[in-house]
Amino acid sequence: MIITSLLDTDLYKFTMMQVVLHHFPAANVEYRFRCRTPGVDLVPYIDEIRDEVRGLCSLRFTDVELDYLRRMRFIKSDFVDFLALFHLNEKYISITPSPKGNGEIDIVIEGPWLHTILFEIPVLAIVNEVYFRNTQREPDYREGRERLREKIKLLGAKPEFADCKIADYGTRRRFSKVWHEEVALTLRDGLGPQFAGTSNVFYAMKHELTPLGTMAHEYLQACQALGPRLRDSQTYGFEMWAKEYRGDLGIALSDVYGMDAFLNDFDMYFCKLFDGARHDSGDPFEWGERMLRHYEANRCDPRTKVLVFSDALDIPKVMQLYERFRNRCKLAFGVGTNLTNDLGYVPLQIVIKMVRCNGQPVAKLSDSPGKSMCDDRAYLAYLRQVFGIAQPADDDASQ
């Protein structure tokens, strides 16, 4: 079985799930799977994927896992008590061949948000591992280890990068569970203090690494349906987050509606309240410069704020960003696919995104054309109008 622990997921799933329990326990949602890599035939592996998901749905949290979560300063005891009773229910997920053909599959997750939020990351990891164990039956781990050594060598070679730290954000698109663990341990041993930790809660617990993460796009997307007014949905999301965490976990995600809309909503109050912001689409250098100017315009010292970069990073790009912004602010870098799925094979660009909440469409309007995802064109057009966002010529968000 690929997934053997419900902790084998990203930390932000638990931080968001706690908000859902306390503030939105009645919300119902729908998620859909999408493979952005052309020419990939996943249909032959549907039965294997279903078997693995069935195994996932048989898991429960152990006492050791619950005790680990309980020790986190921002996790509340009633949430841990809820998790003690929790398991994923197979009735909320369907996996079928897509009517589009071309080897595509449809994965639809639909049900109470509280009971479906933990599907996304392990299901993506399952799809990845099932695909690669069938297409690469003798993985070239030697090549993977050599590439990983070169990355560690590159980052650790120059003294001026001694304070440049990276984190593992690679659970969802990892080559395999075994390889992911080896990568995390190799980074820990090879980088020392330059390895900040991992988003994966299971490996953080098992190997005493720092678990990392705050919020994901789905949280702010759901607020489109849960908030009092669509135009105020991003502000509402940040306010509800602050209500739950009271200044903890203070990294705001900036690209659900694009950078312009984010800066309009991220006023002086939020600039001072939140520790920083995370970049996940668009030009990271331009984004960073705009964030620093925005902090200064709102009477915040940028040197006290954290800029988190997590969009398709590799080590050279991390180093370029570090050189640009060091000593101007605090920095954090989350590297995903380039760490956990770089053995010489083309990684799958797969996502599972929320598309509906309480029966109404929700959407992400990314700063990167092609990363948006919505199955309702009329709603997407309305959302762009409400937030004053022009439609990129090459962005087909419904695909």
UniProtKB/Swiss-Prot annotation:
Claim: Ligase is one of the keywords in the record: yes
Pathway note: Cofactor biosynthesis; NAD(+) biosynthesis; nicotinate D-ribonucleotide from nicotinate: step 1/1
One Pfam family this sequence matches: NAPRTase
Enzymatic reactions: nicotinate + 5-phospho-alpha-D-ribose 1-diphosphate + ATP + H2O = nicotinate beta-D-ribonucleotide + ADP + phosphate + diphosphate
EC number: 6.3.4.21
Organism superkingdom: Bacteria
EC class (word): ligase
GO CC terms in record: cytosol
Keyword terms of this UniProt record: Ligase, Phosphoprotein, Pyridine nucleotide biosynthesis
Residues found modified as Phosphohistidine: H217
GO BP term, example: NAD biosynthetic process via the salvage pathway
A GO molecular-function annotation: nicotinate phosphoribosyltransferase activity
Modification after translation, per record: Transiently phosphorylated on a His residue during the reaction cycle. Phosphorylation strongly increases the affinity for substrates and increases the rate of nicotinate D-ribonucleotide production. Dephosphorylation regenerates the low-affinity form of the enzyme, leading to product release.
SUPFAM superfamilies xref list: Nicotinate/Quinolinate PRTase C-terminal domain-like, Nicotinate/Quinolinate PRTase N-terminal domain-like
Function (record text): Catalyzes the synthesis of beta-nicotinate D-ribonucleotide from nicotinate and 5-phospho-D-ribose 1-phosphate at the expense of ATP.
Family the entry assigns: Belongs to the NAPRTase family.
Matches recorded under HAMAP family: NAPRTase
Protein name: Nicotinate phosphoribosyltransferase
UniProt source species: Burkholderia ambifaria (strain ATCC BAA-244 / DSM 16087 / CCUG 44356 / LMG 19182 / AMMD)
